[in-house]
Amino acid sequence: MRLKVGLLGGGSWGTTVAAVVSRNAPIQLWARDAETVEGINRDHENRKYLPGITLPPALGATSDMAEVVAGADVLVMAVPSHSFRSVLEEARDHIRPWVPVISLTKGLELASGKRMTELIEDVLPGHPVGVLTGPNLAREIMAGQAAASVLSMADEIVVRALQPLFHSGLFRVYTNTDLLGCELGGVLKNIIAIAVGMGDGLGAGDNTRAGLMTRGLAEITRLGVAMGGRPETFAGLTGMGDLIATCTSPLSRNRHVGVELGKGRPIDAIIAGMNMVAEGVKSAPTVMALADRHGIAMPIARDVFDVTQGKRTAMDVFRGLLKSSVGDEAHPG
């Protein structure tokens, strides 16, 4: 029996994953925006988020959530963190028991500090939960360029059963049972990407970028391990791999925010000019709260938090780097 997949969310990444899955299984995408739905069904294009890219004819879309959720053997969540819980609550009345729910969202709930898989467990108890995450830039994948990702679930049997749904051609999908570590890597790298972008916006060089990425990965790993993740996870695709892609690609939303901050633009103006969400800006306050709760020093992430909150400028932060004391490489700072 072929599994039917329902995907909630009509953004660039959700549309990309839906296109990949459509090669392996029947899939239907839900989006609130009527123009997005019409464009996918009539023209096989998501003009708002993936203009100029032709989608597979097998991919259909609808604004009827009940239709998508009720018929799904697997449900994929591709909505921003700020609306994740409310969309789950809408879906709750229509989902069948024990249907696996996979998150594509790399963020935290602002009010609770919870990861998206924790929200799934809150709203849909008893459903297997997982994430698809890694160094995955939507436009590159839609252009047919090779990429690797990770499907992570706590249950090894379930994750291996679902792996073939997402693995397709040059889009290679590995499995990992460290759900917490994989999910946190995708969240935390966004903040480091903003820091790297600030350096790029200020005209810093490759040495600065390499230093920020390396020290940033150390911060990610320290917090991730303190929260229960496995150290090796953060050296893999969902940690270092995702960090490299997000910190270096001109397609990265979080890096773009950092670049504009480095140029001196205010955060509100930057966000207002984007039609997609930069999760790192929203996650920064929650990540700082988690770091404080676990007693983990994250100086780079804290600098990003200060700048995105308007407490300091990118120039102030980078000047401060030159004045901070240094010690053993294994220590924070």
Swiss-Prot record:
Pfam families: NAD_Gly3P_dh_C, NAD_Gly3P_dh_N. The keyword Lipid metabolism applies. This is Glycerol-3-phosphate dehydrogenase [NAD(P)+] 2. NCBIfam families: PRK00094.1-2 (NF000940), PRK00094.1-4 (NF000942), PRK12439.1 (NF009098). It is found in: Cytoplasm. Belongs to the NAD-dependent glycerol-3-phosphate dehydrogenase family. GO terms for molecular function: glycerol-3-phosphate dehydrogenase [NAD(P)+] activity; NAD binding. Keywords: Cytoplasm, Lipid biosynthesis, Lipid metabolism, NAD, NADP, Nucleotide-binding, Oxidoreductase, Phospholipid biosynthesis, Phospholipid metabolism. Its EC number is 1.1.1.94. Catalyzes the reduction of the glycolytic intermediate dihydroxyacetone phosphate (DHAP) to sn-glycerol 3-phosphate (G3P), the key precursor for phospholipid synthesis. GO terms for biological process: carbohydrate metabolic process; glycerol-3-phosphate biosynthetic process; glycerol-3-phosphate catabolic process; glycerophospholipid metabolic process; phospholipid biosynthetic process. Signal peptide: none annotated. NADPH binds at S12, W13, R32, K106, A138, R253, V277, E279. InterPro entries: 6-PGluconate_DH-like_C_sf, 6PGD_dom2, G3P_DH_NAD-dep, G3P_DH_NAD-dep_C, G3P_DH_NAD-dep_N, NAD(P)-bd_dom_sf. Sn-glycerol 3-phosphate binds at K106, G134, K189, D242, S252, R253, N254. It comes from the Bacteria. It catalyses: sn-glycerol 3-phosphate + NAD(+) = dihydroxyacetone phosphate + NADH + H(+); sn-glycerol 3-phosphate + NADP(+) = dihydroxyacetone phosphate + NADPH + H(+). Pathway: Membrane lipid metabolism; glycerophospholipid metabolism. One of its GO terms (cellular component) is cytosol. The active site is at K189. It comes from Sphingopyxis alaskensis (strain DSM 13593 / LMG 18877 / RB2256).
